[in-house]
Amino acid sequence: MSVTATPVNLTELAHRTRQAARDLAGLSPTARNQALEAVARSLENASDEILAANQTDCRLATETGLAPALYSRLKLDSTKLAGAIAGVRSVSQLADPIGAVQLQRELDTGLILKRMTCPLGVLGVIFEARPDAVVQISALAIKSGNGVLLKGGQEALHSCKALVAAIHQGLASAGLNPDSIALLTSREETLALLELDQQVDLIIPRGSNAFVRFVQEHTRIPVLGHAEGICHLYVDQTADLEQAVQIAIDAKTQYPAACNAIETLLVHRAIAPQFLPQLATALQALKVELRGDELTREIIPVAPAAESDWATEYSDLILSIKVVADLESAINHINTYGSRHTEAIVTADENAATTFLHEVDAAGVFHNCSTRFADGFRYGLGAEVGISTHKLPPRGPVGLEGLVTYKYQLVGQGQVVSTYSGPSAKPFTHRDL
């Protein structure tokens, strides 16, 4: 059982992964859930080794000057690891995604059509830093009967090896073939993975804007994901200002490197003179660098915001602020500069909230709460493989439902199409069952 794929032809590796995934998909839901529990226990037993491996990655990252946003994603402490393990167990409690009947219809007596959910097959997941993504994605793949080829960034290599070794140990202890989860370890394998359009069914990139765009532009395999996380918080004229300050603090500082952290704050001009000084005091105490438009700078002393700031994902303790004339102006700004990820309004006006929720074009639109809630675990999805900002589903945080497709099953008793065509054609009953 090898953690890495370096000595193996990737096409052959993908074939082995698919075969193991087919075996996994054929298991009962109980068996797959037992495998997840075995993986969770194995990760707990290997916690010291995993955290030590991550410390090695973090030390090397510091020596090489890794960007702060990436370092934040790379660092894996005991709390984050425990949360990832809890996510594995929560996935085991979710409904089985395989074999669900989406449609059942009688075409004629004794001719029954069903549409049934089934695994996608083999996933290729490429991510920067984010070693906890190994745990999330592996759990969802096991539950949904998919195989996965994991390719982490070189900065997370030791962490990924330790995590996948523990996952393999858990699968083996449950009597399952660990080949359904494979780890690629060299940079050259990233491009090679993107070329496996006959062996890999879906690519899921997780990382920076430039990274995701690179993946999208270098593969013929369908890609699930988002390139940017430019999220906004709009504070309306009827907002509870104390509540708005707390939401802004959480949405910007709770995890600034997250793709659902806000990058721009929009404030209604009627409350800006009262609200902005409160906000600035709170955020600057937390070391947030503030940039503002001209109207903002007339109220609080901050650096000027350039046009490019409205289209920038900082992934850091930096926030751009703009004073807007009204709700319509806020919505127009968001629909112009937003990345269709997650947008929020703070207001006591239900009509304003309804307008915002209906007219803002994003995968997630929130009222009186932080954008940081846009997360598969917090949505009750168990975990997520990523967030999609595409218009076609799946959209938003993607959990199990995004890892299955469907097939049509038609069961008859010798029927042929000629019976239902021509001048004496027998009519279909088309009766939903």
Curated annotation (Swiss-Prot):
GO terms for cellular component: cytoplasm. CDD domains: ALDH_F18-19_ProA-GPR. Pathway: Amino-acid biosynthesis; L-proline biosynthesis; L-glutamate 5-semialdehyde from L-glutamate: step 2/2. Catalyzes the NADPH-dependent reduction of L-glutamate 5-phosphate into L-glutamate 5-semialdehyde and phosphate. The product spontaneously undergoes cyclization to form 1-pyrroline-5-carboxylate. PANTHER family: DELTA-1-PYRROLINE-5-CARBOXYLATE SYNTHASE, GLUTAMATE SEMIALDEHYDE DEHYDROGENASE. Belongs to the gamma-glutamyl phosphate reductase family. This is Gamma-glutamyl phosphate reductase. It comes from Cyanothece sp. (strain PCC 7425 / ATCC 29141). The lineage of its organism: Bacteria, Bacillati, Cyanobacteriota, Cyanophyceae, Gomontiellales.
